[in-house]
Structures are given as structure tokens and as C-alpha cells.
Amino acid sequence: MLTLARQQQRQNIRWLLCLSVLMLLALLLSLCAGEQWISPGDWFTPRGELFVWQIRLPRTLAVLLVGAALAISGAVMQALFENPLAEPGLLGVSNGAGVGLIAAVLLGQGQLPNWALGLCAIAGALIITLILLRFARRHLSTSRLLLAGVALGIICSALMTWAIYFSTSVDLRQLMYWMMGGFGGVDWRQSWLMLALIPVLLWICCQSRPMNMLALGEISARQLGLPMWFWRNVLVAATGWMVGVSVALAGAIGFIGLVIPHILRLCGLTDHRVLLPGCALAGASALLLADIVARLALAAAELPIGVVTATLGAPVFIWLLLKAGR
């Protein structure tokens, strides 16, 4: 038994090391790649200072943090709701952030600065989160709380559809670009949004013990003495914050929160002491690679990153499911 535990521990360490190397390689490639390839030796030239440090670095950091936040949010949702199909958009938080952003675009007639749009997206996500916490205080079961989140998401989706239908052509272009996701407008002015993600990410990565108990199921977690009401509220609030900030930075990006935790579990990373940091590393790496593809796929335009993540990731996910089912 001890030998098996040591083997599993060594395997977990190897996985984390491999994911760390992958993330570093993706980060370096993201800084080098673009319309002009700039190798690390040219980063401190005048051209490198402009393209790498002023344009590519803030975008790369935003992609890294958003990928980590979405993947960790997916892992938290899947443990909390005991559902492998749970993901950040399931509770309606992503759509809530979208409603806040769309309201800001329409009411501000496209004239609001980026920081104001970001605050409105966060406010929309937090409003949905507060509604969910109100349901949670009524001691609803996990399944009913999940259904409440799905219903809120449907309502927010309907509101976004109505807003797009009545918007002008200029607003519609901006809204459609947001709904497909993208990091094209990210620069150092959004650094406050990036900083807002870091403490919550670090805190959740340190909560492996309650997450492992939640993964056993609600009944087992209660029997082990876990205060379900407290942890449900805290985790829903933390997820709402991360998703709201991510939407404010990049718009709606699917797939990462659903598939990354599931893929890592299929690879044997079930302990949240390893799964949570693994999700952060894998989510950051996957979104960095998707962002590179989005930038380089077309010569004169940039693909929406949400389309890239779904196109590249869905076949891999299906292959892993078929492989695990053999």
C-alpha cells in the first residue's frame, strides 16, 4: 500500500512538472509569435520593447490567468455539484457577466472606457452569484441549486438575445466579438483585472482538503464534518468572481472549464492537491496555445479564441473518452 502511494505521488509530481514545462514553452512561444517573429535574443531591442513588452506580454499574462481561472472554476463546479459536465457557465455566472457587459455597451452607446466595461461585467457576475447565494441560504440541495443556476443562465441568455436584436450595427459588432471571446483589446490598462484574479486563484489552490471531501459526495462530506453551507457559499462566490473577471478581460470562452479538469481526471489526477494546480497549469497552457492559433491562423484577421478552443479541444476530449471506455 505504501509503495502504491509513493508511486502515485511520484506520478503526480511528474505530471505537474510536465504541465509546468508545457506552460513555460507556451508562454515563450506566445511572446515570440505574431505578425513578426521576435526571438528571445531580440526582446530587449527597441522593436522587442514595443512588440513584446508593451503588446504581447500583457495579452499573454491575461490569457494565462484567464485559462487558469476557467479551468479551476470547472474543477470546483464539478466537485461541488458532483457532475462531470459542470463548468463555469453552468450556474449562469458567465451569462450574468455578459448581461452586465451588454448593458454597459448599449447604455453607454459604445463610449464607455474599458475599465467601466470590466466593472459592469464583474457586477453582472456578482449579481447572479448573490442570487445563487440567496438560494443556497435556503439550504437547497446541490441538485436544486444547480437547476437554479441553469434557469438563471437561460434568463440571462434570453436578455442578451433581445439586446442584440435591438442593437445598432456598431454595437452589434462589438457584442458579437465579445460573445465569441478574444484578447485583442487587452493591454496594461487591464492589469487591475489580472491582479484581481491572482489572490482568488492562489486561495482556491490551497483548499484541496475540503475539495477532496466534496468530491466524495454531499452526504459523505457532511458525515466527515464539512460545513456544506459555508463551503458552498464561499466556492460559489469565488467562482463567480473569477468568471466575472475572466469575462471582463476576454468575453465568453467555453470548453476550458469543462474539458481540462475532465481530461486531467482521465489521466489519473483525482487528488485535488494535484488536480487544482494541474488545472491551473493545463488551462493556462491550453488557452495560450489556442490564442497563438487565433493570432496566426489568418493573415489579415484574428479568429475568436472561443471558436479555436472548441474546434481544437472537442476532438481530443472525445478521443480521451473513447480511450477511457475501452
Swiss-Prot record:
InterPro entries: ABC_BtuC-like, ABC_transptr_BtuC, ABC_transptr_permease_BtuC
Chief subcellular location: membrane
Spans through the membrane: 13-35, 55-77, 90-107, 111-133, 146-168, 188-205, 242-264, 274-296, 303-322
Keywords: Cell inner membrane, Cell membrane, Membrane, Transmembrane, Transmembrane helix, Transport
Location of the protein in the cell: Cell inner membrane
Membrane topology field: Multi-pass membrane protein
UniProt-listed Pfam families: FecCD
Recorded GO CC terms: plasma membrane
GO function terms (MF aspect): vitamin transmembrane transporter activity
Keyword Repeat on entry: no
Gene3D superfamilies for this protein: ABC transporter involved in vitamin B12 uptake, BtuC
Record-level GO BP terms: cobalamin transport
Family: Belongs to the binding-protein-dependent transport system permease family. FecCD subfamily.
Role, per record: Part of the ABC transporter complex BtuCDF involved in vitamin B12 import. Involved in the translocation of the substrate across the membrane.
Oligomeric and partner information: The complex is composed of two ATP-binding proteins (BtuD), two transmembrane proteins (BtuC) and a solute-binding protein (BtuF).
Protein name: Vitamin B12 import system permease protein BtuC
Source species of the chain: Shigella flexneri
